[in-house]
Amino acid sequence: PLYSSAASDVYKRQDAFKAAIGDRVAKAMKVKYAFQQLEELPAGFAVPEGRVKPWGTCHAVLAAKDLIDGPFAVINADDYYGPEAFRVMYDYLSTHEDGSYYDYCMVSYLLRNTVSENGSVARGVCVTDPDGTLHSVTERTRIETYENGVHFTEDGGESWTDLPGDTPVSMNLWGFGKSFLDEAEQR
């Protein structure tokens, strides 16, 4: 979904998106559009006075809920996942029953394969069981390489914490059943 705070902006953004990406993708698959509106919130929620920033990924997914009729993936447009990641996601979503409590999936990567020599990156640092069950994701907004490996800071660089290169990280490639939408509306 595309974000807009004014109805007239929706059409400008829609046309720009279609021209840059949508028309090309539409040659290979069916394309539908949903637009993230700041004011469109689940019952019981309100926009705080002065807020102009979009709500985030979950709100964007909820903006598309009327277009979702089965399992679906959520990706960031600014990351490249590679074809294998989409194959893994498809295999999972096409073989799992919807409705299992929190039976969702995420494609993770080894941290060492996702860092840049040209500056910092933001990643979701994952805590998993040995069997791969995800327990938590903590966003680290400034992860950098240095001569001894990889580390992150949360205080503007005053202190750093090392991260092993084999740490699983999220680049926001998630898979859900349609039932996730009900859960998302409650939160």
Question: Residue locations for each model-derived region?
Answer:
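Hydrophobic/aromatic residue at the end of a short beta strand that borders the catalytic acidic motif
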Residues: 81-82, 176
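Short beta-strand-to-loop acidic/aromatic patch adjacent to the donor-nucleotide binding site
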Residues: 71-80
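A C-terminal functional module that forms or caps the active site or interfaces directly
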Residues: 185-187
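Conserved core of the sugar-phosphate nucleotidyltransferase
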Residues: 83-171
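Conserved nucleotide-sugar donor-binding
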Residues: 173-183
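Short phosphate-binding loop-to-helix
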Residues: 3, 25-71
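Acidic helix N-cap motif at the loop->helix transition within catalytic regions
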Residues: 15-21
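Single conserved hydrophobic/aromatic residue that forms the stacking wall/gate
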Residues: 1-7, 11
